[in-house]
Amino acid sequence: MAATKHRASKPGPISPNSSTKVWLFSLLLTIQYGAQPLISKRFTRREVIVTSSVLACEVVKVVSAFILMAKDGTLKRLYKEWTLIDSLTASGLPAAIYALQNSLLQISYKNLDSLTFSMLNQTKLFFTALFTYIILGQRQSIQQIGALFLLIIAAILLSIGEGSSKASSTDSPDEILFYGIVPVLVASVLSGLASALCQWATQVKKHASYLMTVEMSVIGSLCLLASAHKSPDGTAIRQHGFFYGWTPLTLIPVTMNAVGGILVGLVTSYAGGVRKGFVIVSALLVTALLQFVFDGKPPSPYCLVAFPLVITSISIYQKYPYRLKKKD
Protein backbone atom coordinates (compact mmCIF):
# COMPACT_ATOMS: atom_id res chain seq x y z
CA MET A 1 0.00 0.00 0.00
CA ALA A 2 0.99 3.63 -0.07
CA ALA A 3 3.62 3.90 2.56
CA THR A 4 4.88 7.35 3.30
CA LYS A 5 7.16 6.06 6.03
CA HIS A 6 8.91 3.31 4.11
CA ARG A 7 12.46 4.03 3.14
CA ALA A 8 13.19 3.48 -0.53
CA SER A 9 15.47 0.58 -1.27
CA LYS A 10 16.34 -1.55 -4.23
CA PRO A 11 14.13 -4.61 -4.69
CA GLY A 12 15.76 -7.75 -3.42
CA PRO A 13 15.75 -11.27 -4.84
CA ILE A 14 12.45 -13.05 -5.26
CA SER A 15 11.64 -15.42 -2.40
CA PRO A 16 10.38 -18.97 -3.07
CA ASN A 17 6.88 -17.96 -1.97
CA SER A 18 6.94 -14.90 -4.22
CA SER A 19 8.31 -17.03 -7.06
CA THR A 20 5.23 -19.24 -6.85
CA LYS A 21 3.02 -16.16 -7.00
CA VAL A 22 4.98 -14.85 -9.98
CA TRP A 23 4.34 -18.02 -11.96
CA LEU A 24 0.67 -18.15 -10.91
CA PHE A 25 -0.06 -14.52 -11.77
CA SER A 26 1.94 -14.79 -15.00
CA LEU A 27 0.03 -17.90 -16.06
CA LEU A 28 -3.35 -16.32 -15.29
CA LEU A 29 -2.39 -13.14 -17.12
CA THR A 30 -1.17 -15.11 -20.14
CA ILE A 31 -4.50 -16.94 -20.32
CA GLN A 32 -6.47 -13.72 -19.86
CA TYR A 33 -4.48 -11.83 -22.50
CA GLY A 34 -4.73 -14.74 -24.90
CA ALA A 35 -8.46 -15.33 -24.44
CA GLN A 36 -9.56 -11.68 -24.30
CA PRO A 37 -9.74 -11.09 -28.09
CA LEU A 38 -11.95 -14.14 -28.63
CA ILE A 39 -14.14 -13.41 -25.60
CA SER A 40 -14.63 -9.80 -26.68
CA LYS A 41 -15.44 -10.81 -30.24
CA ARG A 42 -18.06 -13.35 -29.14
CA PHE A 43 -19.81 -11.37 -26.40
CA THR A 44 -19.47 -7.72 -27.44
CA ARG A 45 -21.83 -6.50 -30.14
CA ARG A 46 -20.59 -4.10 -32.80
CA GLU A 47 -23.04 -1.44 -31.58
CA VAL A 48 -21.37 -1.21 -28.16
CA ILE A 49 -19.65 2.16 -27.73
CA VAL A 50 -15.96 1.57 -27.00
CA THR A 51 -15.72 4.33 -24.39
CA SER A 52 -18.63 2.86 -22.43
CA SER A 53 -17.00 -0.58 -22.24
CA VAL A 54 -13.64 0.92 -21.23
CA LEU A 55 -15.19 3.04 -18.47
CA ALA A 56 -17.24 0.09 -17.24
CA CYS A 57 -14.07 -2.00 -17.12
CA GLU A 58 -12.35 0.65 -15.01
CA VAL A 59 -15.30 0.71 -12.58
CA VAL A 60 -15.20 -3.08 -12.21
CA LYS A 61 -11.44 -2.91 -11.74
CA VAL A 62 -11.73 -0.30 -8.97
CA VAL A 63 -14.49 -2.18 -7.14
CA SER A 64 -12.56 -5.47 -7.39
CA ALA A 65 -9.37 -3.84 -6.12
CA PHE A 66 -11.20 -2.33 -3.13
CA ILE A 67 -12.67 -5.75 -2.30
CA LEU A 68 -9.21 -7.34 -2.45
CA MET A 69 -7.76 -4.57 -0.27
CA ALA A 70 -10.53 -5.09 2.27
CA LYS A 71 -9.78 -8.80 2.26
CA ASP A 72 -6.03 -8.43 2.89
CA GLY A 73 -6.50 -5.69 5.50
CA THR A 74 -4.82 -2.82 3.67
CA LEU A 75 -8.06 -0.88 3.21
CA LYS A 76 -8.21 -0.07 6.94
CA ARG A 77 -4.78 1.57 6.87
CA LEU A 78 -5.49 3.41 3.63
CA TYR A 79 -7.36 6.28 5.31
CA LYS A 80 -4.44 7.08 7.63
CA GLU A 81 -1.55 6.70 5.19
CA TRP A 82 -2.89 7.75 1.76
CA THR A 83 -1.77 11.15 0.47
CA LEU A 84 -2.47 12.91 -2.80
CA ILE A 85 1.23 13.61 -3.39
CA ASP A 86 2.15 9.93 -3.03
CA SER A 87 -0.71 8.98 -5.31
CA LEU A 88 0.28 11.41 -8.05
CA THR A 89 3.94 10.42 -7.77
CA ALA A 90 3.28 6.69 -7.94
CA SER A 91 0.30 6.53 -10.29
CA GLY A 92 -0.33 9.90 -11.89
CA LEU A 93 2.83 10.05 -13.99
CA PRO A 94 2.61 6.45 -15.34
CA ALA A 95 -1.10 6.93 -16.14
CA ALA A 96 -0.39 10.13 -18.07
CA ILE A 97 2.52 8.47 -19.89
CA TYR A 98 0.39 5.48 -20.91
CA ALA A 99 -2.35 7.80 -22.20
CA LEU A 100 0.18 9.67 -24.36
CA GLN A 101 1.70 6.38 -25.52
CA ASN A 102 -1.67 5.05 -26.73
CA SER A 103 -2.32 8.23 -28.70
CA LEU A 104 1.08 8.01 -30.39
CA LEU A 105 0.49 4.38 -31.32
CA GLN A 106 -2.82 5.27 -32.98
CA ILE A 107 -1.10 7.96 -35.04
CA SER A 108 1.76 5.66 -36.02
CA TYR A 109 -0.41 2.69 -36.99
CA LYS A 110 -2.22 4.79 -39.59
CA ASN A 111 1.03 5.75 -41.31
CA LEU A 112 3.09 2.54 -41.25
CA ASP A 113 2.75 -0.90 -42.78
CA SER A 114 2.12 -3.72 -40.29
CA LEU A 115 5.64 -5.17 -40.45
CA THR A 116 7.41 -1.87 -39.75
CA PHE A 117 4.95 -0.99 -37.00
CA SER A 118 5.34 -4.40 -35.31
CA MET A 119 9.14 -4.34 -35.45
CA LEU A 120 9.42 -0.84 -33.99
CA ASN A 121 6.68 -1.40 -31.42
CA GLN A 122 8.49 -4.42 -29.95
CA THR A 123 11.51 -2.27 -29.07
CA LYS A 124 9.53 -1.37 -25.93
CA LEU A 125 10.92 -4.56 -24.38
CA PHE A 126 14.45 -3.18 -24.62
CA PHE A 127 13.41 0.23 -23.34
CA THR A 128 11.71 -1.47 -20.39
CA ALA A 129 14.95 -3.28 -19.57
CA LEU A 130 16.91 -0.02 -20.04
CA PHE A 131 14.71 2.06 -17.73
CA THR A 132 14.56 -0.75 -15.20
CA TYR A 133 18.35 -0.51 -15.03
CA ILE A 134 18.40 3.30 -14.90
CA ILE A 135 15.64 3.68 -12.30
CA LEU A 136 16.01 0.47 -10.28
CA GLY A 137 19.60 -0.52 -10.99
CA GLN A 138 18.52 -3.98 -12.19
CA ARG A 139 20.95 -5.38 -14.73
CA GLN A 140 20.43 -8.03 -17.38
CA SER A 141 22.94 -10.78 -18.06
CA ILE A 142 24.30 -11.31 -21.58
CA GLN A 143 22.09 -14.40 -21.84
CA GLN A 144 19.02 -12.42 -20.77
CA ILE A 145 19.73 -9.75 -23.38
CA GLY A 146 19.95 -12.53 -25.96
CA ALA A 147 16.63 -13.90 -24.68
CA LEU A 148 15.06 -10.47 -25.18
CA PHE A 149 16.30 -10.49 -28.79
CA LEU A 150 14.65 -13.88 -29.33
CA LEU A 151 11.43 -12.64 -27.74
CA ILE A 152 11.32 -9.56 -29.96
CA ILE A 153 11.84 -11.72 -33.07
CA ALA A 154 9.03 -14.02 -31.90
CA ALA A 155 6.74 -11.04 -31.23
CA ILE A 156 7.39 -9.66 -34.71
CA LEU A 157 6.65 -13.04 -36.30
CA LEU A 158 3.42 -13.38 -34.33
CA SER A 159 2.36 -9.85 -35.24
CA ILE A 160 3.00 -10.54 -38.92
CA GLY A 161 1.00 -13.76 -38.74
CA GLU A 162 -1.99 -12.12 -37.06
CA GLY A 163 -1.77 -8.66 -38.64
CA SER A 164 -2.97 -7.38 -41.95
CA SER A 165 -0.77 -6.70 -44.93
CA LYS A 166 -1.94 -3.11 -45.27
CA ALA A 167 0.43 -0.74 -46.95
CA SER A 168 1.41 2.63 -45.66
CA SER A 169 -1.35 5.20 -46.10
CA THR A 170 1.08 7.74 -47.50
CA ASP A 171 3.96 7.73 -49.98
CA SER A 172 5.71 10.75 -48.48
CA PRO A 173 8.97 9.75 -46.73
CA ASP A 174 8.72 12.77 -44.43
CA GLU A 175 5.20 11.85 -43.33
CA ILE A 176 6.22 8.22 -42.79
CA LEU A 177 9.14 9.39 -40.65
CA PHE A 178 7.40 12.06 -38.56
CA TYR A 179 3.92 10.53 -38.35
CA GLY A 180 4.89 6.86 -38.39
CA ILE A 181 8.40 5.95 -37.25
CA VAL A 182 9.00 8.75 -34.73
CA PRO A 183 5.66 8.31 -32.88
CA VAL A 184 6.02 4.54 -32.47
CA LEU A 185 9.61 4.87 -31.24
CA VAL A 186 8.61 7.58 -28.76
CA ALA A 187 5.69 5.37 -27.67
CA SER A 188 8.10 2.48 -27.08
CA VAL A 189 10.34 4.70 -24.96
CA LEU A 190 7.33 5.91 -22.97
CA SER A 191 6.08 2.35 -22.50
CA GLY A 192 9.42 1.28 -21.05
CA LEU A 193 9.55 4.34 -18.80
CA ALA A 194 6.00 3.88 -17.49
CA SER A 195 6.57 0.17 -16.84
CA ALA A 196 9.77 0.90 -14.89
CA LEU A 197 8.03 3.65 -12.91
CA CYS A 198 5.22 1.27 -11.95
CA GLN A 199 7.77 -1.31 -10.84
CA TRP A 200 9.64 1.36 -8.85
CA ALA A 201 6.44 2.47 -7.13
CA THR A 202 5.44 -1.04 -6.06
CA GLN A 203 8.84 -2.55 -5.28
CA VAL A 204 10.79 0.43 -3.93
CA LYS A 205 8.17 2.85 -2.62
CA LYS A 206 6.05 -0.10 -1.43
CA HIS A 207 2.92 1.29 -3.06
CA ALA A 208 0.38 -1.54 -2.99
CA SER A 209 -0.46 -3.05 -6.36
CA TYR A 210 -4.21 -2.93 -5.69
CA LEU A 211 -4.06 0.71 -4.61
CA MET A 212 -2.03 1.62 -7.67
CA THR A 213 -4.62 -0.13 -9.85
CA VAL A 214 -7.36 2.00 -8.28
CA GLU A 215 -5.43 5.24 -8.70
CA MET A 216 -4.43 4.60 -12.32
CA SER A 217 -7.99 3.54 -13.18
CA VAL A 218 -9.43 6.73 -11.70
CA ILE A 219 -6.88 8.94 -13.46
CA GLY A 220 -7.33 7.08 -16.73
CA SER A 221 -11.12 7.35 -16.49
CA LEU A 222 -10.94 11.10 -15.86
CA CYS A 223 -8.70 11.52 -18.93
CA LEU A 224 -11.10 9.41 -21.00
CA LEU A 225 -14.13 11.39 -19.83
CA ALA A 226 -12.37 14.64 -20.67
CA SER A 227 -11.50 13.43 -24.17
CA ALA A 228 -15.00 11.98 -24.71
CA HIS A 229 -16.57 15.41 -24.30
CA LYS A 230 -15.95 16.24 -27.96
CA SER A 231 -15.22 12.77 -29.37
CA PRO A 232 -17.56 10.67 -31.57
CA ASP A 233 -18.00 8.23 -28.69
CA GLY A 234 -19.10 11.03 -26.40
CA THR A 235 -21.66 12.16 -28.97
CA ALA A 236 -22.92 8.58 -29.38
CA ILE A 237 -23.32 8.16 -25.62
CA ARG A 238 -25.32 11.39 -25.38
CA GLN A 239 -27.55 10.33 -28.28
CA HIS A 240 -28.08 6.64 -27.52
CA GLY A 241 -27.19 6.23 -23.85
CA PHE A 242 -24.20 4.76 -22.02
CA PHE A 243 -25.28 1.11 -22.36
CA TYR A 244 -26.28 1.28 -26.02
CA GLY A 245 -25.78 -2.14 -27.64
CA TRP A 246 -25.08 -3.87 -24.33
CA THR A 247 -26.43 -7.29 -23.33
CA PRO A 248 -25.90 -9.19 -20.07
CA LEU A 249 -23.13 -11.13 -21.85
CA THR A 250 -21.19 -7.90 -22.43
CA LEU A 251 -20.25 -8.03 -18.76
CA ILE A 252 -18.13 -11.14 -19.42
CA PRO A 253 -15.38 -9.46 -21.49
CA VAL A 254 -15.63 -6.29 -19.38
CA THR A 255 -15.07 -8.22 -16.15
CA MET A 256 -12.37 -10.38 -17.70
CA ASN A 257 -10.51 -7.30 -18.91
CA ALA A 258 -10.74 -5.77 -15.43
CA VAL A 259 -9.25 -8.91 -13.90
CA GLY A 260 -6.44 -8.68 -16.43
CA GLY A 261 -5.73 -5.11 -15.32
CA ILE A 262 -5.36 -6.25 -11.72
CA LEU A 263 -3.10 -9.12 -12.78
CA VAL A 264 -0.88 -6.72 -14.74
CA GLY A 265 -0.29 -4.79 -11.54
CA LEU A 266 0.51 -7.95 -9.59
CA VAL A 267 2.93 -9.28 -12.23
CA THR A 268 4.69 -5.91 -12.41
CA SER A 269 4.88 -5.75 -8.61
CA TYR A 270 6.26 -9.26 -8.09
CA ALA A 271 8.19 -9.88 -11.33
CA GLY A 272 8.82 -6.53 -13.01
CA GLY A 273 8.06 -4.97 -16.36
CA VAL A 274 10.49 -7.08 -18.39
CA ARG A 275 8.84 -10.35 -17.39
CA LYS A 276 5.47 -8.79 -18.12
CA GLY A 277 6.70 -8.44 -21.69
CA PHE A 278 7.30 -12.19 -21.84
CA VAL A 279 3.74 -12.76 -20.65
CA ILE A 280 2.24 -10.52 -23.33
CA VAL A 281 4.15 -12.22 -26.15
CA SER A 282 3.31 -15.68 -24.79
CA ALA A 283 -0.36 -14.67 -24.78
CA LEU A 284 -0.23 -14.28 -28.57
CA LEU A 285 0.46 -18.01 -28.77
CA VAL A 286 -2.53 -18.70 -26.52
CA THR A 287 -4.71 -16.61 -28.84
CA ALA A 288 -3.52 -18.60 -31.86
CA LEU A 289 -4.25 -21.88 -30.04
CA LEU A 290 -7.74 -20.79 -28.97
CA GLN A 291 -8.54 -19.60 -32.49
CA PHE A 292 -7.63 -23.05 -33.78
CA VAL A 293 -9.69 -24.85 -31.11
CA PHE A 294 -12.84 -22.70 -31.25
CA ASP A 295 -12.79 -21.12 -34.71
CA GLY A 296 -10.95 -23.80 -36.67
CA LYS A 297 -8.35 -21.28 -37.80
CA PRO A 298 -4.97 -23.05 -38.04
CA PRO A 299 -1.89 -21.26 -36.69
CA SER A 300 0.11 -19.40 -39.32
CA PRO A 301 3.62 -20.59 -40.25
CA TYR A 302 4.91 -17.50 -38.44
CA CYS A 303 3.24 -18.71 -35.25
CA LEU A 304 4.78 -22.17 -35.57
CA VAL A 305 8.24 -20.63 -35.95
CA ALA A 306 7.65 -18.21 -33.08
CA PHE A 307 6.54 -20.88 -30.60
CA PRO A 308 9.99 -22.46 -29.97
CA LEU A 309 11.54 -18.98 -29.89
CA VAL A 310 9.22 -17.91 -27.07
CA ILE A 311 9.84 -21.11 -25.10
CA THR A 312 13.60 -20.80 -25.58
CA SER A 313 13.69 -17.12 -24.62
CA ILE A 314 11.68 -17.73 -21.43
CA SER A 315 13.91 -20.65 -20.47
CA ILE A 316 17.12 -18.68 -21.05
CA TYR A 317 15.85 -15.60 -19.24
CA GLN A 318 14.89 -17.64 -16.17
CA LYS A 319 18.02 -19.82 -16.14
CA TYR A 320 20.68 -17.13 -16.50
CA PRO A 321 19.89 -14.15 -14.24
CA TYR A 322 22.48 -11.44 -13.75
CA ARG A 323 24.97 -12.25 -10.98
CA LEU A 324 27.53 -9.93 -9.46
CA LYS A 325 31.08 -11.03 -10.16
CA LYS A 326 32.92 -11.96 -7.01
CA LYS A 327 36.09 -9.99 -6.43
CA ASP A 328 39.23 -12.01 -5.82
What are these regions, as identified by a protein language model?
Residues 1-328:
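Polytopic endomembrane small-metabolite transporters, centered on the Drug/Metabolite Transporter
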